[in-house]
């Protein structure tokens, strides 16, 4: 779990997302409260439940990006789902319980990686010895007992040195690796049958888990495979499951996007299997229930839920009252201005202009954007959003792709050249398309 303070979390989010201070503060406080709760003693700790968040704002202002960045900062089980993918229990489609199953799978992967990292040093030593055994099989006497001579030991040390320096990386050897490592069985689940598919997959994996298979591979690949193999042997599967379930129950975060799309519209009274029914199915998860997963029973009482939606057609009050009550913190994200677009193009880490500069640099082309050019690009994107559909910052991708079209196509023939993109260049590339509303609608 992350131990970052709210100020540090907001500072980290500021490197990637422009504006939306209220939303950043809300998620930063929610994330820090997870850590604060874990410092409490029982039974008070059990009584402190997370305050779920509802983020409201037009498309393309940073709701989903906040979730993506939060996932990396949280260092906790995290899953992002689309509310529109689920249907009411009893109908064809995914049930909402699969959210918790997927979250538990995510936790298993996270905890497994953490455990492998803890045991990596020991696993590396054993893997190195197995590689050396394959390169220099120990000499045996007539009774089949291993003999250990000094000369053999000195040769082994010489090979160990070469192995560590990478001199043997491309040499091929034959090694025994666990069949489970090399033969992953993946089964695609039809809608509504995820549980049965999980059981089948576990069965196939268990069948090959104790078997080994001879494989011929390069030493650098063999070393990685053997390290994973040895690290996996040092992990207790039952302990791993329990740690993963604890991580989900105490620190899990679920981000539900497009929640406005499952609001009931108007007085429509027909079958609504993917709207109000889904909201009612979500209720037990959000307020706390027990979900059966292939790893064990998971309680959802202390999982943090963050929901988001544009609410352009529906309103938050169109959610069923019970669900509204389970999302007590409301955060409104504001629409982006031309000045915000200008900042988005230059300020964030790995901004769009930096990405295009780096891409063209691979062809030996140096790209420079003037301040006037950046301002004009931002204004063009903002104007197209006003004239047509407002898709927020996503419009910048379309405008930039149009602007860079000629350079991207000819870059391979421009090695060593420098291209200065100024206001005149932007006007020439985008002018007609931006001014003509019909062209904007179809091209940008």
Curated annotation (Swiss-Prot):
Pfam families: AAA, AAA_2. ATP binds at residues 18, 60-65, 257, 306-309, 322, 394. It is found in: Cytoplasm. Residues 143-163 are annotated as: Disordered. One of its GO terms (cellular component) is HslUV protease complex. GO terms for molecular function: ATP binding; ATP hydrolysis activity; peptidase activity; proteasome-activating activity. Its main location: cytoplasm. The keyword Cytoplasm applies. This is ATP-dependent protease ATPase subunit HslU. It comes from Haemophilus influenzae (strain ATCC 51907 / DSM 11121 / KW20 / Rd). The gene is hslU.
């Amino acid at each position: 779990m992350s131990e970052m303070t709210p100020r540090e979390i907001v500072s980290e989010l500021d490197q990637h997302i422009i504006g939306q201070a209220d939303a950043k503060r809300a998620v930063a406080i929610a994330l820090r409260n997870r850590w604060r709760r874990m410092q409490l003693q029982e039974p008070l700790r059990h009584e402190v439940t997370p305050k779920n968040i509802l983020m409201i704002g037009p498309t393309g202002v940073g709701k989903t990006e906040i979730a993506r960045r939060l996932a990396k900062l949280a260092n906790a089980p995290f899953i992002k789902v689309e509310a529109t993918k689920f249907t009411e229990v009893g109908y064809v489609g995914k049930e909402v319980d699969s959210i918790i199953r997927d979250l538990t799978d995510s936790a298993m992967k996270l905890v497994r990686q953490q455990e492998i990292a803890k045991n990596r040093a020991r696993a590396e030593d054993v893997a190195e010895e197995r590689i050396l055994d394959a390169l220099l099989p120990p000499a045996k006497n007539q009774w089949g007992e291993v003999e250990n001579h000094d000369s053999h030991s000195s040769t082994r040390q010489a090979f160990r040195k070469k192995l560590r320096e990478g001199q043997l990386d491309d040499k091929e050897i034959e090694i025994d690796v666990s069949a489970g490592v090399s033969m992953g069985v993946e089964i695609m689940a039809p809608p509504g049958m995820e549980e049965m598919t999980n059981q089948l997959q576990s069965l196939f994996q268990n069948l090959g888990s104790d078997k080994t298979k001879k494989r011929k591979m390069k030493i650098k690949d063999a070393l990685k495979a053997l390290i994973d193999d040895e690290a996996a042997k040092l992990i207790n599967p039952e302990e791993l499951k329990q740690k993963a379930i604890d991580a989900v129950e105490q620190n899990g975060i679920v981000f539900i996007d497009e929640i406005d799309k499952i609001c009931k519209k108007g007085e429509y009274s027909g079958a609504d299997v993917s709207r109000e029914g889904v909201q009612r199915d979500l209720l037990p998860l959000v307020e706390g229930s027990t979900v059966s997963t292939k790893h064990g029973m998971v309680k959802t009482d202390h999982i943090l839920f963050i929901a988001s939606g544009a609410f352009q057609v529906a309103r938050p009050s169109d959610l069923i009252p019970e669900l509204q009550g389970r999302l007590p913190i409301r955060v409104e994200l504001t629409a982006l201005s031309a000045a915000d677009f200008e900042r988005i193009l230059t300020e964030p880490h790995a901004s769009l202009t930096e990405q295009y500069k780096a891409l063209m640099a691979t062809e030996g082309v140096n790209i420079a954007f003037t301040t006037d050019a950046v301002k004009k690009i931002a204004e063009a994107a903002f104007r197209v959003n006003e004239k047509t559909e407002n898709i927020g910052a996503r419009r910048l991708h379309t405008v930039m792709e149009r602007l860079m079209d000629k350079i991207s196509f000819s870059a391979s023939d421009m090695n060593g050249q420098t291209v200065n993109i100024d206001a005149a260049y932007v006007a020439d590339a985008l002018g007609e398309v931006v001014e003509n509303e019909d062209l904007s609608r179809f091209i940008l």
